[in-house]
From Swiss-Prot:
Residue numbers bearing the Phosphoserine modification: 94, 191, 216
GO cellular component, one term: nucleus
GO BP terms in the entry: axon guidance; mechanosensory behavior; muscle organ development; positive regulation of DNA-templated transcription
Name listed for the protein in its UniProt record: ETS translocation variant 1
GO terms assigned for molecular function: DNA-binding transcription activator activity, RNA polymerase II-specific; DNA-binding transcription factor activity; RNA polymerase II cis-regulatory region sequence-specific DNA binding
UniProt keyword annotation of Transcription present: yes
Keyword Nucleus in annotation: yes
Covalent cross-link (Glycyl lysine isopeptide (Lys-Gly) (interchain with G-Cter in SUMO2)), residues: 317
UniProt organism field: Mus musculus
UniProt note on tissues of expression: Abundant in kidney. Moderate levels seen in the heart, brain, lung, embryo and lower levels seen in spleen, intestine, testis and thymus.
Matching PANTHER family: ETS, ETS TRANSLOCATION VARIANT 1
Length: 477
């Protein structure tokens, strides 16, 4: 009995298994063929549509491949920085109800192949059919505003690749009726940069319009540009109006421009020059305008007088003892040597070291070193001597102002007309106030080394004390 059951049981089981296999084999074959046929049909339809529609979209948009790689990352970067949970209008997908059903049927297929980005996009494709079908068609001006109007409580269910989705809307604005091709282009795009989402701050930013760069990065380009160039202000305000919600964060950069400071600076510069020109003509009350016009060229030499506003009005008359020449004529800083010589010749008190010879415009330096010394006092050059003065006079030979009289020492003459000479030397009929020896001593106490003064003063007592000694010993000692 045991052996029979041992032999009979496999036989019975074999018959039952054989009969069961015979009945189930056609069913399994039919299922496998049906699955393979559906799989091949779905995959062929999917990839064929992807390739065809992607080529169609690229042909219509005419966007290079490098631009396609960078556009979605930049919007994802801006959304990552601003952290706005937004839901964007998706009108091109709303008329395609077949696409949503196809995406819902393709979810198991896509998930089995590990296309997480495709699965997320298909999940996104279903949502605009439920909540955003009655929205208006997109326009270039309404696309940036759409995050404000479509922020809803169900935005938390939006997957993360959807945040990178609005990056395609501005570049695709040139395609009015591209409803289905945009989906596949986005699907292919979103399947690529999902792995590179963390290092987004290093991605390029070429494919973005200017107004969305301003919306996504308001604090980087605009404070320095708005601070210096005020003509960017209307463009900036226009972009903030287009930006909608992003315009609420822009008033602080607008306050950085500090327009009152710029206008105050612009108004200070001409006012400083105008005050300077008025103090040039301080003593020339009847013809103040002529005095200003005469010194337009050399006016830049003493522009630092603008830093001392308390000396514009009353202190100019007390400045003969200072370094600058003080009154209207010398304040310009243009007192030349020939003008200085004319001023010395015009004063009869200086006739003991310089005087007219009486032969036209000839004059003689009776004491040339004294003339050189006074010129050094006038220009604050204590080392001035006649050699340096004569070299300066040679410059006027070439200019045709004066000449050296041949055969006579220290005799010169002016070659121009006397009236023209005095009109140029004394504009506005104002004589320059020349510095004296007392002023020179006051200046030397503060600024000039006293070597020359010490030699002249210490030599006399030494000469009186050293009379019994030989001159050489006393001089060396």
């Amino acid at each position: 009995m045991d052996g029979f059951y041992d032999q009979q049981v496999p036989y019975v089981v074999t018959n039952s298994q054989r009969g069961r296999n015979c009945t189930e084999k056609p069913t399994n074959v039919r299922k496998r063929k049906f699955i393979n046929r559906d799989l091949a049909h779905d995959s062929e339809e999917l990839f064929q549509d992807l390739s065809q529609l992607q080529e169609t979209w690229l042909a219509e948009a005419q966007v290079p491949d490098n631009d396609e790689q960078f556009v979605p990352d930049y919007q994802a970067e801006s959304l990552a920085f601003h952290g706005l949970p937004l839901k964007i209008k998706k009108e091109p997908h709303s008329p395609c109800s077949e696409l949503g059903s196809a995406c819902s049927q393709e979810q198991p297929f896509k998930f089995s192949y590990g296309e997480k980005c495709l699965y997320n996009v298909s999940a996104y494709d279903q949502k605009p059919q439920v909540g955003m079908r009655p929205s208006n068609p997109p326009t270039p001006s309404s696309t940036p505003v759409s995050p404000l109007h479509h922020a809803s409580p169900n935005t938390a269910h939006t997957p993360k690749p959807d945040r990178a989705f609005p990056a395609h809307l501005p570049p695709s604005q040139s395609i009015p009726d591209s409803t289905y091709p945009m989906d596949h282009r986005f699907r292919r795009q979103l399947s690529e940069p999902c792995n590179s989402f963390p290092p987004l701050p290093t991605m390029p930013r070429e494919g973005r319009p200017m107004y969305q760069r301003q919306m996504s990065e308001p604090n980087i380009p605009f404070p320095p540009q708005g601070f210096k160039q005020e003509y960017h202000d209307p463009v900036y305000e226009h972009t903030t109006m287009v930006g909608g919600a992003a315009s609420q964060s822009f008033p602080p950069p607008l306050m950085i421009k500090q327009e009152p400071r710029d206008f105050a600076y612009d108004s200070e510069v001409p006012s400083c020059h105008s005050i300077y020109m008025r103090q040039e003509g301080f003593l020339a009350h009847p013809s103040r305008t002529e005095g200003c016009m005469f010194e337009k060229g050399p006016r830049q030499f003493y522009d630092d007088t603008c830093v001392v506003p308390e000396k514009f009005d009353g202190d100019i008359k007390q400045e003969p003892g200072m370094y600058r020449e003080g009154p209207t004529y010398q304040r310009r800083g243009s007192l030349q040597l020939w003008q200085f010589l004319v001023a010395l010749l015009d004063d009869p008190s200086n006739s003991h070291f310089i005087a007219w010879t009486g032969r036209g415009m000839e004059f003689k330096l009776i004491e040339p070193e004294e003339v050189a010394r006074r010129w050094g006092i006038q220009k604050n050059r204590p080392a001035m001597n006649y050699d340096k003065l004569s070299r300066s006079l040679r410059y006027y030979y070439e200019k045709g102002i004066m000449q050296k009289v041949a055969g006579e020492r220290y005799v010169y003459k002016f070659v121009c007309d006397p009236e023209a000479l005095f009109s140029m030397a004394f504009p506005d009929n104002q004589r320059p106030l020349l510095k004296t020896d007392m002023e020179r001593h006051i200046n030397e106490e503060d600024t000039v080394p006293l070597s020359h003064f010490d030699e002249s003063m210490t030599y006399m007592p030494e000469g009186g004390c050293c009379n019994p000694h030989p001159y050489n010993e006393g001089y060396v000692y």
